[in-house]
Regions:
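A polyanion-binding, active-site-adjacent surface
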Residues: 2-3, 14-162, 166-169, 174, ...
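C-terminal substrate-binding/active-site "lid" region of AdoMet-derived donor-dependent transferases
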Residues: 196
Length: 231
């Protein structure tokens, strides 16, 4: 699997020497060799690759990767450009439209957010094809908890967006008064109507960033053709 590099490698280096990580690594490698696993192994740490620790301004916590073909590429809620936008992301786009007036794009590729400092971290980084939560409990949670603790310790303001109960269970790890914690129900169609719609998390995030002298996030994901023209 593609190793971590740069700032996150330095920040998380102690984890790689822990007994749980040796077991996790062995399990994950065996799974990739014997089963269909998402995301592709080289994309597993993309959340960390795209958003170095020193650049993190916002953290969005997901659960585990999308588990259907061609979707997952290492950023929570995001899918590759040519894949149908998943239901939770449809609802995220709807809230963005209602909150900030963003148009609803034709794809679910969220790399633009990650490149601006939005760490899009699943708490479990791999999954078996078509089996949600199949890698829960194999050790990823310990690893991503270590990342969350490191983020909490940063001596600068960070916004944590905690959507749904699993993400909100991490709130107890976040006790740095510099940070802003925003909570809402999960954007899934099963729960979005309970308060994700109307939460205004995107505008609240930007207000907080600006108040703290930071550039706001440009949340507008462009249509596929426009993204490709910029590359």
């Amino acid at each position: 699997m593609a190793p971590l590099s740069g700032e996150w490698l330095e920040a998380l280096k102690d984890e790689f020497h822990q007994p749980y990580y040796a077991k996790l690594y062995k399990t994950v490698m065996q799974e990739y060799q014997t089963r269909k696993i998402f995301p592709p192994a080289d994309d597993m740490f993309n959340a960390f690759h795209f958003t170095p620790l020193s650049q993190v301004k916002v953290v969005i916590l997901g659960q585990d990767p999308h588990h259907n073909d061609g979707q997952a590429h290492g950023l929570c809620f995001s899918v590759k450009r040519d894949v149908e936008v998943p239901p939770s992301l449809v609802n995220i786009y709807q809230e963005l439209h209602d909150d900030l007036g963003c148009y609803i794009p034709d794809n679910g590729y969220l790399e633009k957010w990650a490149k601006q400092g939005v760490l899009m971290l699943n708490t479990v980084l791999t999954v078996r094809a078509h089996q949600a939560n199949s890698h829960r409990g194999i050790g990823w949670e310990q690893f991503t908890d270590a990342a969350i603790r490191i983020l909490n310790e940063q001596d600068r303001p960070i916004v944590f967006l905690l959507w749904g109960r699993p993400a909100q269970m991490k709130k107890s790890m976040l006790n740095n008064p510099k940070h802003l914690i925003l909570e809402a129900p999960h954007p899934s169609p099963l729960s979005a109507y309970r308060g994700f719609f109307g939460c205004h998390h995107f505008s609240k995030t930007n207000e907080f960033l600006v108040q703290n002298g930071l550039d706001p996030i440009d949340w507008q994901i462009e249509n596929k053709a426009e993204q490709e023209n910029k590359e």
